[in-house]
Amino acid sequence: MANTTSAKKAVRKIARRTAINKTRRSRVRTYVRKVEEAIASGDKGAAEAALKAAQPELMRAATRGVLHKNTAARKVSRLARRVKTLNA
């Protein structure tokens, strides 16, 4: 347990940030899942639309420090490659 006032405040702050980051991470996963479901169904139009929605969400998470920027870029790249090979 935190003893000093500043440590107690830090604990509160971390709890708030954790909740926010958890929400953002969940949101990213939802968008990525929608792209993967569209790819699995074989619907290229839906997959492209889902990717277009997921890409800014992934990059926003990287900007906010939820994901590393290279991780976000890698995820976008791999999803884009899979969408591109659909009906190729």
From Swiss-Prot:
GO terms for molecular function: small ribosomal subunit rRNA binding; structural constituent of ribosome. Keywords: Ribonucleoprotein, Ribosomal protein, RNA-binding, rRNA-binding. Disulfide bonds: none annotated. The keyword Ribonucleoprotein applies. The keyword Ribonucleoprotein applies. GO terms for biological process: translation. GO terms for cellular component: cytosol; small ribosomal subunit. InterPro entries: Ribosomal_bS20 (IPR002583), Ribosomal_bS20_sf (IPR036510). Pfam families: Ribosomal_S20p. Belongs to the bacterial ribosomal protein bS20 family. Binds directly to 16S ribosomal RNA. This is Small ribosomal subunit protein bS20. The lineage of its organism: Bacteria, Pseudomonadati, Pseudomonadota, Alphaproteobacteria, Hyphomicrobiales.
